[in-house]
Each structure stands twice: as structure tokens, then as C-alpha cells.
Amino acid sequence: MRRVAVIGVGVTKFGKHDRISAELFAEAAAQAIRDADIAPSAIEALYYGNVTGGEGERQLHMGPLAATLLGLPTIPTTRFENACATSHAAFRHAMMEITSGALGPRNASSIMASL
């Protein structure tokens, strides 16, 4: 089984924002990409966890929107809603894709950003 590691992190300021969650996600994701010192083109998929986008923002396509805001409009995206475990569900699925070999280079190492 392949090993998985978090190689970059990013965060937005806590508090009220005038931006939608996909924009906040893109800001944190861009920070994580810089922190990991990888090219955005190394990202093969996006796993987006959000429980309020549909109701609060009237936007049901947050994953593809976030990928587009990151400049990666053609990568596959999956949005997760799982109440208080939403982030866990998204992270878990990203890990499963990497460890199964479905994502990442086909050798011993794997680069994948789960944001």
C-alpha cells in the first residue's frame, strides 16, 4: 500500500467574509500548493467538503468552481457532504484514491493535494 502524507497546508482568516466558500477554499488551496512547493499541474483531482454551499450560497457545483478558481478547470472534482465529518470524508476518499494507485505517479512516490 502506498503511503500518504500532507505536504502543504493553507488557511484563511477566521470570521465573516464577503466571499463565497469556493473562493475561500481556492485561497487556502493556493497557499497549500505554494507551501508544498509543487506545480498546480501535479494535482490530479480535487475533493471538496462543504455542507452549506447548496443552501446558504445556492451553489451546488462548488468542487468544479473551486477547481476553476485554482486554474485547474479540467481535473475531476468530487464534493462531499457528511455533517460534522465532511472534511474527514473528503480527506479519506483522497487517501483511498492514492493508496489504491488510482491517483499519483505509477512508481513508489505520489504527489496529490487533498484540500
Each model region followed by its residue ranges:
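Condensing-enzyme catalytic core mediating Claisen C-C bond formation in acyl metabolism
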Residues: M1-D18, A22, Q31
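Conserved catalytic cysteine-centered active-site region
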Residues: A5, K16, G53-G104, L115
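Buried hydrophobic positions in well-ordered alpha/beta secondary-structure cores of metabolic enzymes
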Residues: I7, A32, I43-L46, S87, ...
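Metallocofactor- and cofactor-centric catalytic cores in central/energy metabolism, strongly enriched
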Residues: R19-I20, L24-A26, Y47, G53
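Short, well-ordered amphipathic alpha-helical segments that serve as non-catalytic structural scaffolds
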Residues: A22-D37, M62, A90-H93
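Alpha-helix termination/capping residues and helix-transition junctions
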Residues: D37-P40, S100
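Beta-strand segments within the central parallel beta-sheet cores of soluble alpha/beta enzyme folds
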Residues: P40-N50, T77-N82, R106-I111
